[in-house]
Amino acid sequence: TDTFEPGSTMKPFIAALSLETGRVRPDSPIVSSPGSMVVTGFPIRDSHPYGTLTVEQVIQKSSNIGTVRMAMNLQPREMWDMFSQIGMGQKPQLDFPGAVTGRLRPYKTWRPIEQATMSYGYGLSASLFQLARAYSVFARDGELVPVSVVRRDAPPAGIRVFTPETASAVRHMLQMAAGPGGTAPLAQTPGYTVGGKTGTAHKQEGRGYAGNKYRSWFVGLAPVSNPRIVVAVMVDEPSTGVYYGGAVAAPVFSQVVGQTLRLLNVPPDADVKSQIVAKVPAVEESF
């Protein structure tokens, strides 16, 4: 399969690592004013000036600045180790044609601006499969398990990436991102709680990025109360006139999740009426 820069879908992993290492709590304040910052001469911006956000709100609103501030308090080796553990830059151990490695450069070569941009998904690449597997760590209480294309009688042993407490905290952030006030209310699925993260990335063109070509992402899990599935959606060069992941990929996620959970006979865990949010405008994500 092809690989792509995953954009803002990487932000929850920076929040998780920051929680795991004790740098922050879910309610820790992070200053994003005035909506822009400079890292070694390179500007980084949010789509809106959010002021002070909690860590939870950084993920809910998809703040580049909030994510970068967390990332720059981490050591490059810590980020690299975590990215490697969730499968970035690693060839999937999967007997399936086309499984690809993606790109994650050695941490010793990272410049500060590269550490910053990798925190929101630029400067590394992954396949859609790798992203879905990475998000399974939040669905499985912080454990990453081997993937198989055939059903197994017993769940395989995995590796511990985050504590169950960290995974639970991030699941709540993902639920906030997929709700009113988040970047993807259109991901909501009647009858089920869902959580996930949008991503929108400029496409690479030559040695830089195309100004008007995008990839739109949404990666999430459901039900949040007891995750059964992880779904990753990527739309290449959306042609509807809108390109944010919350507007393009999230509705596809919603349809797939609803149909799949019903096929699996998963009982609803949410009130249908309380989830009708189609008229609630999504927050435009920063990317």
Task: Indicate residue ranges for each PLM-predicted region.
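Short, charged, low-complexity patches
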Residues: 131, 245-258
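Short amphipathic alpha-helical signal-transduction/dimerization elements
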Residues: 139, 178, 254-261, 265
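Beta-lactam-recognizing serine transpeptidase/beta-lactamase-like catalytic domain environment
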Residues: 1-8, 13-239, 245, 277-287
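Gram-negative outer-membrane assembly/targeting C-terminal domains
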Residues: 261-287
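Short beta-strands and strand-coil junctions in structured, solvent-facing domains, enriched
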Residues: 239-241, 262-263
